[in-house]
Amino acid sequence: HCRMDKSRLPSPIALTINQYPIQNLTQSQSLRDMMVEISLFFEKHSSATIIAHNASFDFNFAHSHYFQTLATDDWYQWKHNNNVICSLELLRAIYLFKEKLTTIEIPNSRFAYPQFGLEGVSKKNGIFYQSHEAEGDVKSLRDLYGLMMNEAPDIVSLAHSCANKQEAKR
């Protein structure tokens, strides 16, 4: 958990959506301390593959906060080993290239467009964790990623290969 800067007021909409306790906003660790912890975690696990739903959002968020807090001078640490897989893009690829989905159900909008957001896809597939909070989102992604591996192991394997620039060049 991370406390907010005392100079900022929380958005009432964000408080409602995220259901984040006010106590955590005032008493948890500072943003800088959290970003140092995140940097050390990624440094320790630098060879691991990062799987994130909407990875560009997460990367931009981390990059921006690394810069703002000066927690590390390695602002691009997620991208050094070319090991980021965006499960949102992977899910779109599975939807596009797999003729018939048998394991994963994709919800549609009111206008019959497929919706690939983590919360909606998770609910459609019977995965229920607290959304918009780290632990719940990680558990949802873990379960959804398992469904993707069952649905299209060849596409998931290709995503892992393409995440590595050396493999992608072949």
How should these model regions be labeled?
Residues 161-170:
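Acidic catalytic cores of enzymes that act on phosphate-bearing nucleotides/polynucleotides
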Residues 18-35, 41:
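Metal-dependent phosphoesterase signature
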Residues 1-20, 42-162:
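Metal-dependent phosphoesterase core characteristic of DEDDh/y 3'-5' exonuclease domains
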